[in-house]
Structures are given as C-alpha cells and as structure tokens.
C-alpha cells in the first residue's frame, strides 16, 4: 500500500478480519520489519531508527489489554515510571477513567489483580489508554482498543484527544 499520514493527523484503518490492519500498525513499532518497500516515520526509514528510540515515540493500545498486579497508579506508571500523581490523574481524565477510579474506595491506590480481572473490559481499556498517554507518544495507535466502551465514552475519549493532544498522530 502507499499511505501518507501527516504529523498530528488522525486516521482510521478499516477492513475485514485478516486484512492486515493490525499487521500494518505493528510495523510502525518495528514488532517486525517490512519485507518489501519501506516504511518511513518522520521522513526516515524505520529500519534506521534505534528500536528503543522508535518505540519510545510510539504507544500502542490493543483490543486485548494487559493490567498487572498492583495499584492503579502503578499500572498507569508503566507508561512513565517517573510520572507524578497529577500526571497520572490527567491522563486518566483524558481516557475517561478518572470517573470510575474516583468511585473506588481507595481511588488510585485501588489494587488491580493480575490481568485486571477485578475491573470491567471497558475500564481495563481506559486504564491502558491512560498508560499509553502517560508516555507522551508522538504516535498513538489504538487497535480496536475502545471496543468494550459505550459510544458516549468513546466519543468523549476522541473529543479529549482532539482538544488536549492535537499534535499526536
């Protein structure tokens, strides 16, 4: 395919099961390399980037998200271990997670069990979106990552992205 995405642009990639949507986004983070042609990010072939440097610029949130045993603060900080409580809370607001977190008795100090089985699928997705945002990526990839949230919440997440992180691709 021939595709050009400008910095700060939001696009959607649609297609049937097995059409290559997930494969395409995985190429951006060099989970594997293209075998023909080239993939450019910032005008440079992704193969020229140090993998760590490239991956520091890209955050991916997948449909099947992973949460770890620990508090909500600890889970979100996997995106940036040096983040302040305020930074964690800010990204949770953008991801529409702050509302339900505030309802937990221990709020951000609520313990999440391994795999996140003590929160709903939609809550898990929003916490993982918050984690990805905390990294402050230049490229944010959402691979069917709001499939478990209702349409109103999905719209609020997208609105927050447009207003608060307009330069993120």
Where are each of the predicted segments found?
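ABC-type nucleotide-binding domain
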Residues: 1-169
């Amino acid at each position: 395919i021939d595709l050009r995405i400008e910095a700060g642009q939001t696009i959607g990639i649609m297609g049937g099961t097995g059409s290559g949507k997930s494969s395409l986004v995985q190429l951006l983070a060099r989970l594997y390399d293209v075998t023909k042609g080239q993939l450019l990010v910032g005008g440079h072939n992704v193969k020229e980037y140090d993998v760590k440097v490239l991956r520091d610029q890209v955050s991916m949130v997948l449909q099947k998200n992973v949460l770890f045993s620990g508090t909500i603060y600890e889970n979100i900080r996997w995106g940036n271990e040096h983040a302040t409580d305020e930074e964690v809370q800010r990204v949770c607001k953008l991801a529409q997670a702050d509302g339900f977190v505030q309802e937990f008795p221990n709020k951000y100090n609520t313990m999440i069990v391994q795999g996140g089985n003590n929160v709903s699928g939609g809550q898990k997705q929003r916490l993982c979106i918050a984690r990805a945002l905390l990294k402050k990526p230049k490229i944010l990839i959402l691979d069917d990552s709001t499939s478990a949230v209702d349409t109103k919440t999905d719209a609020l997440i997208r609105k927050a992205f447009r207003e608060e992180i307009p330069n993120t691709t």
